[in-house]
Amino acid sequence: MKFKDMPYKRVDYDKTAEQFKTLTKRVKEAKSGEELWEIHQEYYKVYQNMMDSMTIAEIRHDGNTADPFYAAEKDYYDETAPMLSSLATDYQRALYESPYRSFMEEKIGRVAFATMDNAIKSMDESIIGLMQEENALTTQYNKLIASAKIPFDGQVCNLSLLRPYLTGNDRTVRRQAWKAYSDYFMTVADELDDIYDKLVKNRTAQAKAMGYDNYIQLGYYRMNRNSYDRNDVENFRRQVKEVFVPFAERVHEIRRKRLGLEKLSYIDNEVYFKEGNPDPVGTAQEILESGQKMYAELSPETKEFFDFMMENELFDVFGRKDKKQGGYMTYLYQY
């Protein structure tokens, strides 16, 4: 099914909340591992139906942050998602603490329970209000960045459409483009500062309410880091400083000489050749189709995956106004 044809229906909070509560009660009352497994199959259906609706709304909102319908849906989920997440975590906690956990580990694996442990450690009913505020702030930030309108070279660009000018071969044009880029951020600096300040205070308050010293540990749980910890990351940062930074300095020095510059500037970032970076050949659509050909030649598995994505119009890779910045991959369980 093509993405544009996938039906969307807003998640009914009251109905879904009652389903989670009923399933949680049944988990606690289960008399065997087999019964618990049957309950968990029902949980999958409720959870996947909820997540698919939320994900479809999110993708369509991110594709056009100015769309009033999906903007309203985003606001709805900013409010209801933390409450539903709390109820889903209650279910996971009951499953995690079940006397039939070993049976379930054989069914769904230990990693699933490690993920549940992270969810339990990062969710509490007492922080729902703070999570709702956090969602509203991140939505405000994403809309602000996506709605950038920067006059340049006879057109109005957003941040993505301005990017080719930031890395072009004409250094004067690059400087002008970077100035336009910076000027835009100065016009929204106060709003960005306010969002950042509120987010730091909000996330710190969430962490404190959960019994952590600061947001770091809570953030690790939220990002589901179940195979490494803060000490591993500290060691990685040390290696970056000791090994990668000197290496990067040598690479940038080579680049400086190649560009014929006395000193590299921020306007030379991601510029690798004096005559300009290599330009992709063909239109954006032709480049995407070339990618499809490459993946077809790589393996039968990558061909099947890429063809499925193309046939069902599941890629959204072209820049346009009001589209959310950045990129991501997500999952639709029922499609």
Model regions: which residues?
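Active-site-adjacent "gating/activation" loops or surface patches in catalytic cores
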Residues: S160-T172, G282-Y335
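A well-structured
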Residues: M1-V281, S290
